[in-house]
Amino acid sequence: VITSLLRATDCDMKTAIPRMQNYFEFYVEIFGALSFKQSLTNDSELREMVESGIVHVFENCDAKGRCMRVMQYNQIRTGLNSDALQITKMFHYVTMRTLKNYPMTQKNGFMDVCDMGGLSLENFSLRITRSNLLMSSRFLPCKVHKICVLRPLYFMKFLLRAVKPYAFPGPMARHFLILSQDPKDLLKDPVFCR
């Protein structure tokens, strides 16, 4: 965790130390103790969430070796896998495994794609969206290079524009793209994939 955070912040201790404190506080709040270790073999709920298809990771998606996390909101089903805490734990597990397996992602960051296509209002949870944004921007020991929101629900277009300066202050907000149903939007440089 510490190595990943130092790489993500380019060894800037002024940035790394508060982020490290935030991560450890977040970890204790979610898992109860720093000594707790997530494992698919011991946690059937976590395994079920990982296998649910909500989050997919694609490695080495650009010339700098960044990984892409694709979150498909239409895979979240009310009552089945919609518990915000379980989704947070699953997102943490997937992110930490990716950082461990792909050191270039530690340094160069993730590209996140949030696909809301096929999502209905009854399955939408602002809490899940907000917790994932905050977790990526404030707590996890990683850098987010670019975020693309594909096919957002109509009201989300306005909500995300208001939230992005708060969730990603400074220059990061430039890399937060909201793409509509129009395929031409994909040509507006959302992600450089090989």
Where are the regions that the model predicts?
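Short aromatic-glycine motifs in intrinsically disordered, low-complexity regions
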Residues: 129-139
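Short coil/turn segments at secondary-structure boundaries
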Residues: 18, 82, 125-128, 160-163
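Extracytoplasmic/secreted proteins and extracellular or luminal domains
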Residues: 139-140, 168
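Aromatic/basic-lined ligand-recognition segments
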Residues: 1-120
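Contiguous terminal or domain-adjacent regions
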Residues: 1, 153-194
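Acidic, metal-coordinating catalytic cores used for nucleic-acid/nucleotide bond scission
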Residues: 118-122, 151-156
